[in-house]
Design a protein with these regions (language model features):
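Short, low-complexity, polybasic intrinsically disordered segments
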Residues: 214-239
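Aromatic-lined substrate-binding rim segments of carbohydrate-active enzymes
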Residues: 91-94, 98-158
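CBM-like carbohydrate-recognition segments
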Residues: 1-40
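An active-site-proximal structural segment forming one wall of the substrate-binding cleft
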Residues: 124-129, 167-201, 227, 231-234
């Protein structure tokens, strides 16, 4: 083991010990150093398979929306694990609450926001924060395979074009009225949640069925690239802490 980029002819034994041990400590491993009667030091390592490191953008998340049961957090605070013969608290293992829910939940009426008015949404978010967890979000606008319309009614009332599936409306993402209303919402969303102390990541897309881009429908399929660039730029300009990957 030697410092990265160092000339091997100039590396001393002390330098090797300091840099070598420091590198493996940073990796979160248990270390045993064995000195021998040579100029080199040998390091044996064993992976730490028990400690939860909590590295950014890694580890376990809990999926949720505003419709979780009233005892949601009570259940997750007491999950029985047969191998342990006891219960565990899920927030000791999962560091992030991942909320994937409708635009209409976050923004039921123009200028009205669910993080202020929706008691169930507020409760599930506060439960995560009370347990020292972080937040992540996906905003879904497509109503296909949904119990309720995912886009707020005021968007369609303003004239946004849409298609229907099973009696529910979904907006065309290349419609200018949809884009105007959605951009206004994301700006408000950013004012509330563009905070790295609370938020782990925000999906920088959310269009399409389940918020997945490979299911998209357009007024004109030729607008596909334009829509992609529009929504990515919108999230990047409003939210510094986004996960901008899309299923496309």
């Amino acid at each position: 083991v030697q410092p990265i980029g160092a000339d091997p002819r100039k590396v001393t034994r002390d330098m090797t010990e300091v840099y070598g041990v420091g590198a493996f400590l940073a990796a979160g491993c248990q270390i045993y150093k064995m000195a021998v009667d040579t100029e080199a030091d040998y390091i044996k390592i064993w992976p730490d398979k028990k400690t939860m490191q909590g590295n950014p953008l890694s580890g376990w998340v809990i999926y949720a929306n505003e419709n979780v049961s009233d005892d949601f957090w009570k259940k997750y605070d007491h999950i029985y694990v047969p191998e342990k013969g006891t219960t565990v608290k899920i927030s000791d293992y999962a560091r992030t609450l991942y909320i994937r829910t409708h635009w209409s939940t976050f923004n039921p009426a123009e200028g009205v926001y669910g993080w202020d008015t929706d008691e169930k949404l507020k409760k599930v978010i506060q439960g995560a924060l009370d347990r020292g967890m972080r937040l992540s979000f996906r905003v879904i606008v497509d109503s296909r395979d949904r119990k309720n319309e995912a886009t707020p009614a005021y968007v369609f009332d303003a004239g946004a074009k849409y298609y229907t599936d099973n009696g529910k409306r979904s907006p065309y993402p290349d419609d200018p009225i949809f884009q105007e209303k959605y951009a206004k919402f994301i700006e408000a969303f950013a004012q509330k949640y563009n905070n790295p102390d609370l938020v782990e990541f925000i999906d920088g897309y959310g269009l399409g069925k389940w918020g997945e881009a490979h299911t998209m429908k357009y007024i004109d399929p030729k607008n596909r690239e334009t829509v992609f660039n529009w929504i990515i730029d919108l999230y990047l300009n409003c939210l510094l802490y986004t996960s901008d990957a899309a299923d496309e």
